[in-house]
A protein has these predicted regions:
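General small-molecule cofactor/ligand-binding pocket signal
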Residues: 160-162, 311-314, 344
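Helical element adjacent to the flavin cofactor pocket in flavoenzyme catalytic cores
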Residues: 121-184, 188-192, 196
Length: 380
């Protein structure tokens, strides 16, 4: 379900001395012009996030990225985005209001802790593809609308899927991976193997000596960002927005009212809001009720009806989610290939020049599949 090509930023009361009252919702409406001009038009029409001087600073500061200088972006991997931002002469208001929520939405990582290259890659992608920043939602839960249809497609073509067999180790003979052994001692033979797991699981499956190889040494060095997915139900609509919303300075850096945006969730006429709560490093040790209370306190800043309309909440804690794009991490991202000719890596942490996301994971899967087909063709 594609949404209007609009980025919506929410600023709580007292966020800035540039205006009184609040909350303020600023919508960046992208035009039908080719990229990057559609985004430039959206920025020029902003009233709160950027003032006139900041619009000029934004254009000049991001110019190397907008013109597609990928090598320039790669040279910024060793510094944080906030450091790069200040070096380019852009304001603190822009950093806190526009880029900080973006950093949390992209990688669940604070703007002071994320690699400048990781952020610049995303900006370059937005600038090079007209609809890159447009949001879309599934028409219902991912398990029902995405995962199961893919699984059914594969089953109809003779593919066996078993998600109940944790892998204990990979099995090798000479320079080939010949299969895997499960925790209960069963073995599976394989012509090719793709490790499609989070980076910390991949590090456990790859032999220690292999992790020293330049092709994959980053697998053992990359860390992961914790995140809490919060699902909150309300007995009436509390938001008039059906698109993604970036919430400044709160535990709601990116959220959406799926009750309005996705009718497949079956909460008609009410609000069902999903939130990526980040950064979650300091929240993991807290109990659910404390976290929900903090979320509701922040929600009240944007949606005055939130507390009185609240019905229930469910939290899903992910201690190790996507790879953490800290300074220096981008150069550690491995490709799909490993030192073993028939063993491949897939996952959002691999180097596909895309942020850690479902889209990035899918791109990595294509790279791994290409490797399998090439290997199979070479053996035929």
């Amino acid at each position: 379900l594609w949404q209007p090509h609009t980025l919506t930023y929410a600023m709580p009361p007292g966020w800035s001395d540039r205006w009184e009252g609040g909350p303020i919702f600023e919508e960046f409406h992208f035009t039908d012009a080719p990229s990057p001009f559609n985004g430039i038009g959206a920025v020029l029409n902003a009233k709160y996030v950027f003032n006139t001087l900041e619009k000029l600073l934004f254009a000049t500061g991001t110019l190397p990225v907008l013109v597609g200088d990928q090598k320039y972006a790669e040279r910024q991997d060793d510094i944080s985005y906030s450091t790069w931002h200040r070096k380019r002469g852009m304001s603190e208001h822009m950093l806190r209001t526009f880029f900080a929520p973006m950093s949390l939405a992209l990688n669940f990582t604070h703007i002071d802790d994320i690699s400048a290259e990781a952020m610049l890659r995303v900006m370059a992608y937005f600038a090079s593809s007209k609809d890159a920043s447009r949001a879309g939602f599934l028409d219902g839960p991912p398990g029902d609308r995405l995962i199961e249809p893919i699984a059914e497609y594969l089953r109809k073509r003779g593919v066996a899927i078993d998600t109940s067999v944790p892998i204990a180790e990979l099995l090798f003979e000479g320079d080939r991976c010949v299969g895997a052994r499960t925790n209960d001692g069963r073995t599976y033979d394989a012509d090719s193997v793709i490790i499609a797991t989070p980076v910390h699981n991949a590090a456990q499956l790859l032999p220690g000596e292999m992790l020293r190889d330049p092709l994959v040494h980053g697998v053992g060095k990359l860390t992961s960002s914790p995140v809490i997915n919060a699902h909150l139900w309300f007995d009436k609509p509390i938001s008039r927005y059906s698109n993604l919303i970036f919430g400044c300075g709160t535990l709601l850096p990116v959220h959406a009212d799926l009750g309005q945006a996705s009718p497949g969730y079956e909460w008609p006429g009410k609000s069902f809001i999903e939130i990526c709560v980040a950064p979650a490093d300091d929240l993991m040790k807290l109990d659910d009720s404390t976290i929900v209370e903090r979320i509701l306190t922040d929600m009240q800043k944007f949606y005055p009806l939130a507390r009185e309309s609240f019905v229930k909440a469910k939290l899903v804690r992910v201690p190790k989610s996507v790879y953490r794009a800290s300074p220096g991490a981008e150069k550690l991202r491995p490709g799909a290939r490993t030192p073993v000719q028939n063993l491949f890596l897939a996952g959002c942490y691999t180097n596909h020049r895309f942020p850690a996301s479902i889209e990035g994971a899918m791109r990595s899967a294509r790279h791994a599949a290409d490797g399998v087909l090439e290997y199979a063709g070479a053996r035929a």
